[in-house]
Amino acid sequence: MFQGKILEYDNDGIVCHDTDDRLIWNQSYEMTAPELSVCEQYLAVYDRGGTFIYIMSERGLVKKIETATPIERVCVARQGTVAVLMKEDDVSYVRLYDKKGQELASGEFYQEKGSFPVDIALAPDAQKLAVDMLDVTKGKTCSTVTFYNFGSVGQNEIDNNVGTYSYKNTMISELVYTESGKLLAISDAGLIWFDGAQKPAPKKQIKFEREIQSVFYNNKYVGISYSDTKKENSWHIKVYDMNGKTVMENDTEIAYNRIELLDNNEICVRDDYNCELFTIHSIRKFRYTFDRQLYNVLSGSDGQNYTLVSVSYTHLRAH
């Protein structure tokens, strides 16, 4: 979903239409591995391993950017600014561009120094950038999260670095900035929350006690699921708020291929034909087996209506 609209994208282009299937805009391109980054009124669609970025708004194309180096990751901020992680040979590059394509900041990382960037996250105001570095030179993994501040506070620091935090025997695979400005780091060992308007610092850490099957999140919550050792063919779901407090727990017997938080903050668990919905208060709200393959589930604004997108037909309203 993007501004209440439905997005469809593939290697040839991206289409935005409303829930009544009316076309809003259509942008064509040629990409091998298109991926999306969304923040409020802007989205960036980019070619992972390619060199093209399309910054889009609810009205359509804002700017097309071509990079000189293959792209690994793009993050967009609420005003359309994008942070771009690129890599070529043993050198990684980070560039910051405004929505007109003008370069705002840049940096380089050399793998010969022992570590390399795994992920980046751009704060919604585009003033802070977090970089996740992985070091495996000594036979053990060590992840480091470094924060850069491009505002007045960061100008007083060397290379705009306002904080660096290392975690031994840990591999942080993903960084996520929420709309409130908190950063979530997802690792093989657990979840770490960082907070701070100018100089973010660790505020909460939860260690995983067993092997995690899935981690899913939105701007308000982050959830995990793992196999229930007490029940065969059952998975336990646990959801935390962005302060690290447990807010929801329940079990599902669907051998799902998709688990996610919907726009109304309900948890949707589904495979190709089965769908289950839980409220954020742990109540199982809905379960059904469909005779057509499910493509997507979208929540309405009132918490009662849903759009179920199937292969054969597009819209079905369910209460």
Predicted regions mapped to residue ranges:
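Repeated scaffold domains used in trafficking and secretory/extracellular systems
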Residues: 1, 31-38, 69-77, 114-121, ...
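Short beta-strand elements that form the blades of beta-propeller/WD-repeat-like
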Residues: 2-9, 41-47, 80-87, 127-133, ...
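Short loop/turn segments that connect beta-strands within beta-propeller blades
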Residues: 19-20, 57-59, 98-100, 151, ...
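A short beta-strand motif characteristic of beta-propeller blades
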Residues: 22-27, 60-66, 104-110, 158-165, ...
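Non-cytosolic head/periplasmic domains of membrane-anchored proteins
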Residues: 26-124
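Short, solvent-exposed loop/turn segments at conserved positions within beta-propeller repeat blades
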Residues: 87-90, 137-143, 230-234
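Solenoidal tandem-repeat scaffolds enriched in leucines and small polar residues
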Residues: 93-170, 174-178, 183-184
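Conserved small/polar residues in nucleotide/adenosyl-binding loops
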Residues: 314-319
